Amino acid sequence: MKRIFKYLMMTVIAAGTMFYSCETMELEDLTDPNALSPDLADADLLLNTIQVNYLGAMQDMQYNGAALGRISHMGGRVYYENFGGGTVSGAWGALYSGILPDIDAIELQNGEENLLAFHLGISKAMAAHIMMGLVDSVGDIPFEQANNPTEYPNPATSDDEVVYAGALALLDEASSYLSAAVAVTDDLYYGGDTGNWMKFVNTLKMRAMLTTGDYAGALAMTGVIDTADADMQFSYGTQELQPDTRHPWYASDYTTSGAN
């Protein structure tokens, strides 16, 4: 009898504990800690991602150009068979899935003090460069309806001339931000040198003028990249342990124990 009573009491206590736990749990808290809202994102980390995405996009497009010009091995003799619908998928995804949403997230955090002017200046310049590269590669691309999935789940393409105008507008915004920017240490290309970033922006404007036939404007453009010290280069690191900051080809071939 005592044993039965003991088990009965244990059952009652366990049931009461479960009931109390259910009452105190936040069952309606559906926030995913692994999917933070844009306003909670770290602007410096967003900038890092934009810079790395830009690097990958430009490497993809530069390889395509090198292969077409036979500067690099194309892997075949027939152009049509080597360059299909996925040729610019890397740059396409970097722009629409990565860079543009990240720029929007940084803009949400940029207050009246304009403390993220440098972040926005260089990010918009890189976005404009990829936009022009995609137009040069495939022609019309989504722009006016892009990155608005609620209203345009399947965005239509915009005329290439409209996209180029949009890229030039982004470059104007980049110039405005950079002129008021305080350099940061998270610049993986120019090390926070706003002057060189302005030259980069002006060089892209000059290139756009050449592409669109504004030769007089291109000839009149000043403040462009015209010396080796203003050359735009991505600065890889030397760290082997994760995160491995070395060049991917170097990382795949060399370890502390020697060559692979």
Language-model features: where?
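TPR/TPR-like alpha-solenoid repeats
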Residues: 130, 137, 201, 208-209
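Membrane-proximal, proline-rich intrinsically disordered regions
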Residues: 19-79, 86, 94, 101, ...
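Conserved, well-structured interaction surfaces
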Residues: 72-185
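Sec-dependent bacterial lipoprotein signal peptides
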Residues: 1-21
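Hydrophobic-face positions in mid-chain alpha helices that act as interaction patches
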Residues: 216-260
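Acidic interhelical loop/turn segments
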Residues: 176-200
